[in-house]
């Protein structure tokens, strides 16, 4: 009885470890990645600081990134607007915002071998934006059935 109990506990421990390992491999959902890369309510953000955070996850310097100064909930609301053709000319899940928001565009000015050393310039403006939306994943909040997953452009 002793060896079987030890064996079953070991199997349970291995199974728990496997579940935890799989959960950590799942990483961010597409909507979480969208929020991290494009939603920032700070209209005075510093591109060098914010892009270092994004580049850390990528392990390389991103050349261009647009931050929308709005909430994730407002971006989700855009998913309720009529859908249309995305800039890739294939996808039909793009939605235009009905109001303009402040944006900051960070454009790389100095690319470095080490992603922490890249430098950016900022351009601020007030623009409409287009997001691609998909049904939420099981890891996303059930609060929103459809979520933004890609910033398709500004205009």
UniProtKB/Swiss-Prot annotation:
Establish whether keyword Nuclease is in the entry: yes
Q: Which residues are glycosylated?
A: 41, 96, 107, 114
Instruction: Identify the keywords attached in UniProt to this record, alphabetized.
Output: Disulfide bond, Endonuclease, Glycoprotein, Hydrolase, Nuclease, Signal
- Where does the protein end up? Cytoplasmic granule
Q: Which SMART domains match?
A: RNAse_Pc (SM00092)
Which catalytic residues are annotated?
38, 150
What's in the GO CC field? cytoplasm
Q: Tell me where on the tree of life, at the top rank, the source sits.
A: Eukaryota
Q: Please name every pair of cysteines joined by a disulfide bond in this record.
A: 47-106, 61-118, 79-133, 86-94
**Which residues constitute the signal peptide according to the record?**
1-25
Gene3D superfamilies hit by this protein: Ribonuclease A-like domain (3.10.130.10)
- Classification via SUPFAM superfamilies: RNase A-like
User: What are this entry's molecular-function GO terms?
Assistant: endonuclease activity; nucleic acid binding
Keyword set includes RNA-binding: no
Q: What EC identifiers does the entry list?
A: 3.1.27.-
Q: Tell me the InterPro entries matching this sequence.
A: RNaseA (IPR001427), RNaseA-like_dom_sf (IPR036816), RNaseA_AS (IPR023411), RNaseA_domain (IPR023412)
Q: Which residues bind substrate?
A: 33, 62-66
The family annotation for this protein states: Belongs to the pancreatic ribonuclease family.
Protein task:
Cytotoxin and helminthotoxin with ribonuclease activity. Possesses a wide variety of biological activities.
This chain's protein is named: Eosinophil cationic protein 1
Organism for this UniProt entry:
Mus musculus
Q: Which gene encodes it?
A: Ear1
């Amino acid at each position: 009885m002793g060896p079987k109990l030890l064996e079953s506990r070991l199997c349970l421990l291995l199974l728990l470890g496997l579940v935890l390992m799989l959960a950590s491999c799942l990483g961010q959902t597409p909507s979480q990645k969208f929020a991290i890369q494009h939603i920032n309510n700070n209209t005075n953000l510093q591109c060098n600081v914010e892009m270092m955070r994004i580049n850390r996850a990528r392990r390389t310097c991103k050349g261009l990134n647009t931050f929308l100064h709005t909430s994730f909930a407002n971006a989700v609301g855009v998913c309720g607007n009529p859908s249309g053709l995305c800039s890739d000319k294939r996808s039909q899940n793009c939605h235009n915002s009905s109001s303009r928001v402040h944006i900051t565009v960070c454009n790389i000015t100095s690319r470095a071998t080490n992603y922490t050393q890249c430098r950016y310039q900022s351009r601020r403006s007030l623009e409409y934006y287009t997001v691609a939306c998909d049904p939420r994943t099981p890891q996303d909040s059930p609060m929103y059935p459809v979520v933004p997953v890609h910033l398709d452009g500004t205009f």
